[in-house]
């Protein structure tokens, strides 16, 4: 059934439901969000989508806002979270290679994580339920326990090029990272 007033969904029996999950692995805009709908209507007669080989004004404006809000200097737009994970894996490994031509390719990921359904994303997903049907996965991935800095440190070697994690794990519940854990991993 149609959604009404951004608050939730209705079924064929006219019962209303509030969605406290906000979708699975997506950003939450609500349902039938009028501001979002109007922005889409305004844009549809202009440019809907271009390859990331080309820039467009909305993309540049969004990049500028992201840079200003985060203090970071680069933005990489993708079509999905899975594609973002694939890009992150490739950037980490390419950076390590270009830095000194080394084989520093190991990535540390967290147990009980979920990063997507592509082969690369499954490789850094810390859940064998998702991984097993698609093995062998890409190599060089190690797993540590979320919110356990010593577990992460135990996995770091001279071949480590990246650590990948969700700041809030949503697999099997809602588990936010402790600030001290994030600060320790960042060091």
Please state what every model-predicted region is:
Residues 157, 175-187:
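Catalytic PLP-binding core of fold-type I/II PLP enzymes
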Residues 2-13:
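Single conserved hydrophobic/aromatic residue that forms the stacking wall/gate
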Residues 16-102, 106:
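Glycine-rich loop-to-alpha-helix module at the N-terminal edge of alpha/beta enzyme cores
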Residues 17-21, 154, 186:
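Beta-strand scaffold of nucleotide-dependent catalytic cores
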Residues 65-162:
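PLP-dependent aspartate aminotransferase-fold enzymes
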């Amino acid at each position: 059934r149609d959604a009404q007033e951004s608050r939730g969904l209705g079924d064929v029996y006219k019962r209303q439901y509030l969605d406290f999950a906000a979708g699975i692995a997506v950003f939450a805009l609500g349902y039938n969000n009028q501001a979002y709908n109007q922005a889409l209507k305004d844009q549809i007669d202009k440019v809907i989508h271009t390859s990331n080989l080309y820039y467009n004004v909305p993309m540049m404006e969004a990049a500028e806002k992201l840079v200003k809000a985060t203090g970071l200097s680069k933005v990489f737009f993708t079509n999905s979270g899975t594609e973002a994970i694939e890009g992150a894996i490739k950037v980490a490994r390419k950076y390590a290679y270009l830095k000194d031509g080394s084989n520093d390719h190991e990535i540390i990921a967290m147990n009980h994580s979920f990063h997507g359904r592509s082969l690369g994303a499954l490789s850094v997903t810390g859940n064998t339920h998702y991984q097993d049907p698609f093995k062998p996965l890409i190599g060089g991935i190690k797993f540590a326990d979320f919110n356990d800095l010593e577990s992460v440190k135990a996995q770091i070697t001279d071949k480590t090029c990246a650590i990948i994690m969700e700041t809030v794990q949503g697999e099997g519940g809602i588990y936010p990272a402790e600030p001290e854990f994030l600060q320790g991993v960042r060091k």
